[in-house]
């Protein structure tokens, strides 16, 4: 339940075995073994049915997003704001092995209590995000032309996130992006 209540967390849900039925923004989704979804704090998540095991990987913007990451692997990057739909990834066996190495390292790092732990956790998180970004780019066959379209979607979501209280019209965001409202 805390996973569903905390509105500040970025989330990875990774089905380890069986299936997981969820609702994201009132849209039902069923995830199978070795599938991952990425969610932002703006997504409303409801876990409907757990028929197996899943790993939840969560972090808040104070831990990761405030650092100077480039657009591709930031909280405003491809995984979290690259499309208008929820990012759902099907992992190959080799991708599962690579991501499992990182999650195993994270588990080990949690046991080490020293002044370097936070930075090491941040590095491992970035590695996890980079690998998932590569998997997503491969899935969506991101070419240089398509990259521009994804960048536009990313920029739009960042603007909405930052200005939604005072800006209500598509025209407002189109002006900030120097675009016609019809192109958004």
Task: Map each language-model feature to its residues.
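Generic protein-terminus/edge-of-domain signal
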Residues: 1-30
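Amphipathic, well-ordered alpha-helical segments in soluble domains
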Residues: 11-14, 98-102, 124, 128-131
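Short beta-strand His + acidic residue motifs that chelate non-heme Fe in jelly-roll/DSBH
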Residues: 21-23, 39, 44-50
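A hydrophobic/aromatic-rich effector-binding and dimerization subdomain
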Residues: 48-108
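Short, Lys/Arg-enriched, Trp-marked, Pro/Gly-tolerant hinge/linker segments that flank
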Residues: 90-93, 113-120, 132-158, 162-177
